[in-house]
Each structure stands twice: as C-alpha cells, then as structure tokens.
C-alpha cells in the first residue's frame, strides 16, 4: 500500500512538472551559433594574419531573425584555443598590429562583454573555439548590427568595419575587449566586399 501511494505521488509530481515553462534567457547572454545556408551570404571579407598571409574569410548577410549572420572560416590558428572575436569601427587592417581598425564597434555607447550588467558593445561576438587542426568554421548572429544605410547599427558605413580575432579568449566583461590580448587576424569590410 505504501509503495502504491509513493508511486502515485511521484507520478503526480512528474506530471505537474511537465507543464512548467522554460525560464526566459538572461538579457546579456552570449549569442548562440546558428545553422544558415552559406550560399545566401552577400558580403565576403578576406582574413589576413600579422604577416599578411590569407588565413580564411568571413561572409555576412542580414539575418532572418535580427541583426547579421556572420559565417567565419579560418585556419592557421592556435589549435584548441578559445579566441576573442569582435567587430571594430573602421574597415582598415594595417599590419602588423591592426590598430588602424580603431576601437570596438559601439554605436550605442555600451560597456564591453556579454556578462557586463551595463550591456555589451554591438561588436561583441562569441569566442571562436578552434579545432585541434587550427581551424574554425562557424556561423553566428550579431543582433545589434546591420547593413542598412542610415542605420546607427550599420557596419558598412563610409569607413566600413573590421573583424578582428584576438590571441586569447574574451572574458565577456573587461573593457574594451575582454582581456583578449593582441589583434592577430583582421578582415576589412568595405563597400567593395559584395559577393559576385
């Protein structure tokens, strides 16, 4: 009898738990990587390292959800590393340090990092998780960016924007770029980057 009563109580608890809704995502969560058809991308950016060697590319398109979808395919990176990845305010990749790209893309004047209670820069992107072969190939979403002329969030304005890979992981908190170290790879997005 006790076993039957215990079994009925456990069953009732299990059924009651099924109707619970998933809690909403926290406001400053790291955007998830996505699956998107790569043929739909309209802007192509070549990536170069500090020696000037081509090490991959980035493709960009307006997202069906919000912001931009960014496809990055890169090689010759540190195997197994987690590397900071950001959008910078100028489409310039002067070697060897890529400082010509200026500061982080931040048209909304926020603080840096997905874990920062003051919000995050529009140019903050998730860390790149490099494979054991030194390669990364991923599509991610940048919700606070656009290619629309006249938009404050447009990364394709008069001076373009740059995509930068850093030498270390972004801690998602520290200004201005999450303690992610030197800029080691750069790709400049300018008006002539449209895919043919």
UniProtKB/Swiss-Prot annotation:
Cu cation binds at residues 86, 166. Keywords: Cell membrane, Copper, Disulfide bond, Lipoprotein, Membrane, Metal-binding, Palmitate, Signal, Zinc. Residues 1-17 form the signal peptide. It is found in: Cell membrane. GO terms for biological process: removal of superoxide radicals. One of its GO terms (molecular function) is copper ion binding. It is a lipid-anchor. InterPro entries: SOD-like_Cu/Zn_dom_sf (IPR036423), SOD_Cu/Zn_/chaperone (IPR024134), SOD_Cu_Zn_dom (IPR001424). A lipid is attached at residue 18 (S-diacylglycerol cysteine). Pfam families: Sod_Cu. SUPFAM superfamilies: Cu,Zn superoxide dismutase-like. Zn(2+) binds at residues 71, 137. GO terms for cellular component: plasma membrane. Monomer, and homodimer. Largely unstructured monomer in solution. Well-ordered homodimer in the crystal. This is Superoxide dismutase-like protein YojM. It comes from Bacillus subtilis (strain 168). The lineage of its organism: Bacteria, Bacillati, Bacillota, Bacilli, Bacillales.
């Amino acid at each position: 009898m006790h076993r039957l009563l215990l079994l009925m109580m456990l069953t009732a608890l299990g059924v009651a738990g099924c109707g619970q809704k998933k809690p909403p995502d926290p406001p400053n969560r790291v955007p998830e990587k996505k699956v998107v058809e790569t043929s739909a991308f309209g802007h192509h950016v070549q990536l170069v390292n500090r020696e000037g060697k081509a090490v991959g590319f980035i493709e960009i398109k307006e997202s069906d959800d919000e912001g931009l979808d960014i496809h990055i395919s890169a090689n010759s990176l540190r195997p197994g590393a987690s590397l900071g990845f950001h959008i910078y305010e100028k489409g310039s990749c002067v070697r060897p340090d890529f400082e010509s790209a200026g500061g982080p893309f931040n048209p909304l004047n926020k603080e840096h990092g997905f874990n920062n209670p003051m919000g995050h820069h529009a140019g903050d992107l998730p860390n790149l998780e490099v494979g054991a072969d030194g390669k990364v190939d991923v599509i991610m979403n940048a919700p606070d960016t656009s290619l629309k002329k006249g938009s404050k969030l447009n990364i394709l304005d008069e001076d373009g924007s740059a995509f930068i890979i850093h030498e270390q992981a972004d801690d998602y908190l520290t200004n201005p770029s999450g303690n992610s170290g030197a800029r080691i790879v750069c790709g400049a997005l300018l008006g002539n980057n449209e895919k043919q």
